[in-house]
Amino acid sequence: KFKTIDMIGLSAGAWLTSIIAAVDTRISRSYLISGVYPMYLREGNEFPLPDVDKILLSQSSYLDIFVMGSQGADRRQVQIFNQFDRCCFRNKKGLLYERAVSKRTQTIGEGSFSVIIDKTHARHKISRYAFEFILSDINRNDF
């Protein structure tokens, strides 16, 4: 038996991780790297998945999905954005909604949500910095 189930996703995998963490409360920690913004912050290559997003967004917003993915006892969601990513999901836009999602998560109950901006490179990948953060966070065993 596993103590926790954690999930890491990059790019479209981050989008998928956000959805799975929102609907499956067995996911303790979810790490989304360069793959999902609320629709109002997207630009260029950050296009939605037409059929899936249409169905999904008729029921909730991405901010709701982030709250659902981080809310609950022993649950945490961390979004990591590569500030200088040449592909997509760059900049510091995640910081614009971090406080609102974190506050809503705490208002409902336990859980945490945070955004990290990775300034160490300009590629669309999981950097050494992000990887070391994730491993350190998982090894904290604070649940």
Which sequence ranges carry the predicted segments?
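Gly/Ser-rich "nucleophile elbow"/oxyanion-hole loop immediately N-terminal to the catalytic nucleophile
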Residues: 1-11, 27
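Hydrophobic anchor at the start of a short beta-strand
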Residues: 5, 77, 112-113
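Glycine-rich nucleophile elbow surrounding the catalytic serine of serine-hydrolase chemistry
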Residues: 9-21
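Structural motif
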Residues: 10, 82-84, 119-120
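Acidic-histidine catalytic/liganding microenvironments
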Residues: 24
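A short, hydrophobic beta-strand element of the alpha/beta-hydrolase
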Residues: 30-33
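The feature captures the conserved acid-bearing segment of alpha/beta-hydrolase catalytic domains
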Residues: 38-109
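C-terminal catalytic histidine-bearing segment of alpha/beta-hydrolase fold enzymes
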Residues: 102-143
